[in-house]
Amino acid sequence: MTQLPELGLRSPNNKSPTGPHPLEHLLARLLKRRRRSTLMSSPRSLLCSISGPGSHLLSTHPILCHSVYQPPQPASRPQAKRYQGLLPVPLAPHPLCLSGQLYLPNIPCTVIDGCGPVISHLKLTMYPWGLPPSHLGSSSPFSANMEQWDYYKSQTRFAPFLPESFCGSPLPSEQSSRPFGLAFKVLCAATCQPPQFQLLWLCPYKLDLHQRICLPPNLALVLLGALWTSPPPGSFLQPPYNRPYKLYKTN
């Protein structure tokens, strides 16, 4: 186990497990509970609800009750299909694809807690490396890409869309990249002394459906640790981008 001091997270430095992900059953239970909830349910019983384009967000983290979803102008967002539910992908699931292959985009919110307001968001996008398809089932060499950090800081109202996930599809080529994303919402509490960063949630997401499931921090860290591997030698990630869990203070 390797210690990641920035988040105090321990992660395996060996291969990720094959077969269904160990958190799939937990996500499935969240989905089942979420499907039984309706738009008419009490916000208190749901802990937190956010209405978006064709979506209804239910979070299990109490702090998210202070979240406010602010949709972008229609012209700034690509045309999205009007799905009302969570649709499984009919292809065979990839071991790293969670909860029956959900299409879950990343829709940021403004979050306030008892320590101070959010002043920055951080999006870490996990990309597949060019391994033969036979390796995808047993090895998962993903690494967070910090290159989108500067762009995302200016897009806190609405995260940029990424290409469709490669999950359940053939290995992507350089001409047709299909990244699988793990979006992290990070809180920078400016009023704390010293300023602190706090991981609020982790959202697996894909394109085409304005809906997401967000995990509380304890499950997020477990999932992150299960997926983490170091960048392969000679990868395009160069310092400081090969330190994906070092969170930089911003104004």
From Swiss-Prot:
<feature type="region of interest" description="Disordered">
    <location>
        <begin position="1"/>
        <end position="22"/>
    </location>
</feature>
<protein>
    <recommendedName>
        <fullName>Uncharacterized protein NDUFV1-DT</fullName>
    </recommendedName>
</protein>
